[in-house]
Amino acid sequence: MAMTYHLDVVSAEQQMFSGLVEKIQVTGSEGELGIYPGHAPLLTAIKPGMIRIVKQHGHEEFIYLSGGILEVQPGNVTVLADTAIRGQDLDEARAMEAKRKAEEHISSSHGDVDYAQASAELAKAIAQLRVIELTKKAM
């Protein structure tokens, strides 16, 4: 039996996941993080993107995170997300439309603030589409 630890993924609206996992993969402020059992304690910001949860027996779940905080303690990991949406609950057409609008905004932006905001919106839309794609593959 593989080693596991307890994971809680919580958003402002609801608890998205609580249970034993073998590992997770998430994008922290300094880059991609793989958290395995026995990981050193850590507290870091999470960038908008996905969390890949590998549950017991290798089953995977993907959740979109709009950002938040990751806390790693011995035997327990907590993700406090600004917004969290399960892959199967994301709307692909809506994400595609958000991506298109952000791309238009980038091409027509004139100021640094407009460009930065449009880039952030584009990154969120691309992350949502990636979660949708991976969720479909896992099913």
UniProtKB/Swiss-Prot annotation:
Record keywords, A-Z: ATP synthesis, Cell inner membrane, Cell membrane, CF(1), Hydrogen ion transport, Ion transport, Membrane, Transport
For this protein, the record's InterPro entries field holds: ATP_F1_dsu/esu_C_sf, ATP_synth_F1_dsu/esu, ATP_synth_F1_dsu/esu_N, ATP_synth_F1_esu_C, ATPsynth_dsu/esu_N
Indicate how the chain sits in the lipid bilayer: Peripheral membrane protein
Q: Does the keyword Zinc apply?
A: no
Reading the lineage from the top rank, the first entry is Bacteria
Q: Which GO terms describe its biological process?
A: proton motive force-driven ATP synthesis; proton motive force-driven plasma membrane ATP synthesis
Subunit-level organization: F-type ATPases have 2 components, CF(1) - the catalytic core - and CF(0) - the membrane proton channel. CF(1) has five subunits: alpha(3), beta(3), gamma(1), delta(1), epsilon(1). CF(0) has three main subunits: a, b and c.
State what protein this is by name.
ATP synthase epsilon chain
Which organism encodes this protein? Escherichia coli (strain K12)
In the UniProt record, the gene name given for this protein reads atpC
